From Swiss-Prot:
Protein name, UniProt field: UPF0127 protein MTH_1377
Residues of the signal peptide: none
Matches recorded under HAMAP family: UPF0127
Family statement: Belongs to the UPF0127 family.
Entries under InterPro entries matching the protein: DUF192, Saro_0823-like_sf, UPF0127
Source organism of this protein record: Methanothermobacter thermautotrophicus (strain ATCC 29096 / DSM 1053 / JCM 10044 / NBRC 100330 / Delta H)
NCBIfam families in the cross-refs: PRK03760.1 (NF002996)
Length: 123
């Protein structure tokens, strides 16, 4: 599975490496039961799912995560740090849900309205 880097184009900062969860099982498992979240995860949400269809849960998570909700225009529409066992629905519908190690949003200076892009990394 190819890794990509999440870049905040607005601020010129990196949010780190991610993998895309493209299968049902990879989306279902997500980052559950992992202590090491050096590589984040991107969930691609089907078009037309709406705000509640973009929501996530933190069931069976062992560590907090930073989560970015990004629309089809690659703009951040919401961001949050979630603790294990929380449920969250974004303020606006998202096309991509990006799960990252806690602190990545703060360290990159990422804010709602910023533009994000994915760049290919070497495996």
């Amino acid at each position: 599975m190819m890794k990509r880097e999440v870049i905040n184009k607005t601020r010129g900062t990196s949010l780190g490496a991610v993998r895309f969860a493209r299968t049902f099982m990879s989306r279902f498992r997500g980052l559950m039961l992992r202590r090491d979240v050096e590589t984040g995860l991107v969930l691609e949400i089907p078009v037309g799912r709406g705000r509640y269809g973009s929501g996530i849960h933190m069931f069976f998570m062992l560590v907090p995560l930073d989560v970015l909700f990004v629309d089809g225009d690659m703009r951040v529409v919401d961001s949050v740090t979630l603790r294990p066992w929380q449920i969250y629905n974004p303020r606006k519908p998202a096309r991509y849900v990006i799960e990252l190690r806690e602190g990545k949003i703060r360290d990159s200076g990422t804010r709602v309205g910023d533009t994000i892009e994915f760049r290919d990394l070497q495996s």
